[in-house]
Amino acid sequence: MVLPLMICYRPIGIIHSPFKEPKDVPIQASAAKDIEGTVEVFPEFSEGLKDIEEFSHIILIYHFHRAKFKGLLVEPYMHEEKHGVFATRAPARPNPIGISVVRLVERKGNILRIRDVDILDGTPLLDIKPYVPEFDVRENVRIGWLEKNVHKLEKARDDGRFFSLNFNYIFPASLLEAPERAKL
């Protein structure tokens, strides 16, 4: 099988949070307890939200629009040794896709009010899935090098190693507009 050189996704919405700069963002949702935000789903995708309010938690899949890829070996947060990027949760990746499990507080039309947000304001949303513990939780897991460091999670914040200050170069603002208005 020959894989395509590029896969192109169109955002289905935008994630809004109180975090305007990467340095303020908790590095995982479990360290962002009770932080509120909203998900604005573009109107042409709002029909896909039918019945989402029946779930207490949802999985947000998004594009790390300000991440800067530096290579396949990274020094992750909470550790001073390099690891393969695929053995980390670092945002700077060959395909900068993020996932977060958040609490769904309420839905009003195409707006979802959420809690436990660890996402930068203005982040492009690629997809939403319901969180189902029977599907998503595994028992008897090993967490590798994180075993010695996971206790640092609650206080850990971005330190600038993975994010670009000039995100317009990486992700043009026009792509954050509703797809029918985007100037592609």
Swiss-Prot record:
UniProt domain TsaA-like: residue ranges: 9-140
Record protein name field: Probable S-adenosyl-L-methionine-binding protein PYRAB06630
UniProt superkingdom: Archaea
Gene3D superfamilies tied to this protein: YaeB-like
Family according to the record: Belongs to the tRNA methyltransferase O family.
Signal sequence, start to end: none
Stretches of the chain forming a coiled coil according to its record: none
Organism taxonomic ancestry: Archaea, Methanobacteriati, Methanobacteriota, Thermococci, Thermococcales
Annotated binding of S-adenosyl-L-methionine, by residue: 26-28, 65-66, 89, 120-123
A Pfam family assignment: TrmO_N
Family annotation (PROSITE patterns): TSAA_1 (PS01318), TSAA_2 (PS51668)
Alphabetical UniProt keywords: S-adenosyl-L-methionine
Keyword Lipid biosynthesis in annotation: no
